Amino acid sequence: MSIRRMAAIGYAVISAGVAAFQIALAAGAPWGAYAMGGVSPGHYSPALRVAAVVQAALVMLMAGVVLSRAGVALPAWSRTSRWLVWLVVAVGAVSLVLNLATPSAGERLVWAPVAFLLLACSVLVATERQEPEE
């Protein structure tokens, strides 16, 4: 298996964990101190619960783009993924900066390494050459 495919699968697995965390927040898990700058320690308000569901959907959409670009899944997205993967890289870079700068020590400890791994995987997928079909 190529590095590109492994990076894409790694991105998708990590993204599934991030999405599960967001869904748990939306469902009432008391982990608000570990998300969104720790502005809402404990349970999320109804508005933040909606935001968590939206974030989970966006994370999985980005995973789909990365998987498509690597040729792992969603072949119908292949052409669009050529440029969308760079949007995923940009979002990953911003996410890493924000997670390093957050006032929440817990969020920084947990999510900065996750953001780094997501950024690294997306850069690998975006920059590695497409291998020919076998």
Predicted regions, residues:
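Interfacial loop at the N-terminal end of multi-pass membrane proteins
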Residues: 4, 8, 26-51, 70-73
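N-terminal signal-anchor transmembrane alpha helix
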Residues: 10-24
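Alpha-helical transmembrane segments of multipass membrane proteins
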Residues: 23, 63, 96-100, 123
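Hydrophobic core of alpha-helical transmembrane segments in multi-pass integral membrane proteins
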Residues: 53-67, 118-123
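Mid-chain, well-packed structural core segment of small domains
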Residues: 64-98
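Membrane-helix boundary connector in multi-pass membrane proteins
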Residues: 94-111
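Membrane-water interface at the C-terminal end of transmembrane alpha helices
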Residues: 118-134
